[in-house]
Amino acid sequence: MLLLKASAICGKGNEGKRNKKGGFTLIELTVVLAIMAIILMVIAPNFSYVKDSAKAKVDKQNCAAIERSVEMLLAEDAISSSVTNIKITSSNGNVQISGISDDTGKSKLQDLLEDLDKPQSGDSYNVDIENGRKVTVSIV
């Protein structure tokens, strides 16, 4: 009897029991992966919204910069008040301007807009001038 108790205390007699090692089971890993997949499915559409929103904001800022530049050149009479429409195209860092016949006004506007990027949502910027004062910029 005394031998049995000693073997139980020393851990002998447990040969039939499974020796457990630390780690995760396949079910636990599967559950974690499923939860991560669900989280990604919820978050992914928000990333595309943020990207589209950023593009729209860049276009809006570029339009505002063009508007201020044209208004300034109109105030300086570098652009004639008879000009009613200007088309601005930017590609590979080159800004092309059509609708201004005066080379001085055209070159001043090109200098002001030298860092202008191509619009994110179109091909070019369209500048409408009403009564030689009111400037409206849109993307075409």
Swiss-Prot record:
Modification sites for N-methylphenylalanine: F24
Cellular localization per UniProt: Membrane
Sequence intervals crossing the membrane: 24-44
Primary localization class, coarse: membrane
Proregion span(s): 1-23
Keywords recorded for this protein, A-Z: Membrane, Methylation, Transmembrane, Transmembrane helix
UniProt superkingdom: Bacteria
Keyword RNA-binding: no
Membrane topology: Single-pass membrane protein
Family matches, as Gene3D superfamilies: Glycoprotein, Type 4 Pilin
One GO cellular component term: membrane
NCBIfam families: IV_pilin_GFxxxE
Function, in words: Not yet known.
Protein name, UniProt field: Prepilin peptidase-dependent protein A
Gene source species: Clostridium perfringens (strain 13 / Type A)
